[in-house]
Amino acid sequence: MSYRPYQQIERRKSRQIHVGKVAVGGDAPISVQTMTNTLTTDAEATIAQIRRAELAGVDIVRVSCPDQESTIALKEIVREVNVPIVADIHFHYRRAIEAAEAGAACLRINPGNIGSAERVREVVKAARDHGCAIRIGVNAGSLERHLLEKYGEPNPDALVESALEHAKILQDHDFHEFKISVKASDVFLAVAAYQQLAEVCDHPLHIGITEAGGRRTGTVKSAIGLGNLLWAGVGDTMRVSLSAEPEEEVHVGWEILKGLGLRHRGVKIISCPSCARQGFNVIETVAALEERLAHIQTPLTLSIIGCVVNGPGEALMTDIGLTGGGGGRHMIYNAGKTDHTIAADGMVDHIVTLVEEKAARIVEEEAAAKAAAEQAAQEAALQHETV
């Protein structure tokens, strides 16, 4: 692909922290998060749900810990999954300490509702002792009373002031491994608050539109809000909040990042909405391909266009392309060039095979290049030693 300046996004410069093995902020990739909706005390169900999210590509998972039974179960959950776990804590400072001891990689708290300064000190000590990061989670629906009285309602100034007050509490304890979120269900409020916060601090930001709604409504609201922020370079880690299964949140989060070219994973399908000119059933073909190609993680682009109006042009910019043609024959493109024609029968199977083979070649080539680079580095090191 050619270099296109209009596609470049300059990300906000932020401090880098670590949530377990995942770097957040700085030049680290924007991580995708979700949250379980099982009872945390049901460790088996929670682990199964996290594993489904892992298959979808999640980087970090948040788990609610409302009681001691949950923090007890958390230890098993952390042990059995492959991604860092954030323990969601409200009000009960002991739960935060227990979660840190259980192996949580991050504690999601509001220092202001944990209790006395002594309790905050104990939580910070537990986080430091166990290598936990902290997420300061400000939400328009649970702002402190004094800020509501000061501003009259949740607004960007109130959210940012709350976030900075909480950040100062941690900084006063010489704790700096934290990220901040200022979420709201209103897209305008959330975006404005994040933009304002991004201008006054360099802490990594967890972005999200809270209580966004069901699958369709929540996806649209999140795409508008998060897409706006990410396009402006704001955001180091993100969650799409949906009234849906966690893996669906992960899928949508990845699609937002892929749409902006910020991360790449799996097959990106470019397809037309179809019309009377289509040479094959585009909608059914795309649905089948999305399902059949979901297992591929190697970044690839695939165009599925029903006719020759836009098909050849789209195929120029994709790894593999399909354009509907006449007489029941359709053109397959490889790397933007015409390659061969195919009939509708068996077309989906054929494209799946082409994509799988190309993905396998890319993996092999990348592995070979990595091995060659490592070999060259070893030889250079040996040569340096003999000089």
Swiss-Prot record:
[4Fe-4S] cluster binds at C272, C275, C307, E314. Pathway: Isoprenoid biosynthesis; isopentenyl diphosphate biosynthesis via DXP pathway; isopentenyl diphosphate from 1-deoxy-D-xylulose 5-phosphate: step 5/6. GO terms for molecular function: 4 iron, 4 sulfur cluster binding; 4-hydroxy-3-methylbut-2-en-1-yl diphosphate synthase activity (ferredoxin); 4-hydroxy-3-methylbut-2-enyl-diphosphate synthase activity (flavodoxin); iron ion binding. NCBIfam families: ispG_gcpE, PRK00366.1. The gene is ispG. It is an enzyme of class 1 (oxidoreductase). The keyword 4Fe-4S applies. The lineage of its organism: Bacteria, Pseudomonadati, Pseudomonadota, Alphaproteobacteria, Acetobacterales. It comes from the Bacteria. InterPro entries: Dihydropteroate_synth-like_sf, IspG_bac, IspG_bac-typ, NO2/SO3_Rdtase_4Fe4S_sf. Keywords: 4Fe-4S, Iron, Iron-sulfur, Isoprene biosynthesis, Metal-binding, Oxidoreductase. It comes from Granulibacter bethesdensis (strain ATCC BAA-1260 / CGDNIH1). This is 4-hydroxy-3-methylbut-2-en-1-yl diphosphate synthase (flavodoxin). It holds the Pfam family GcpE. Its cofactor is [4Fe-4S] cluster.
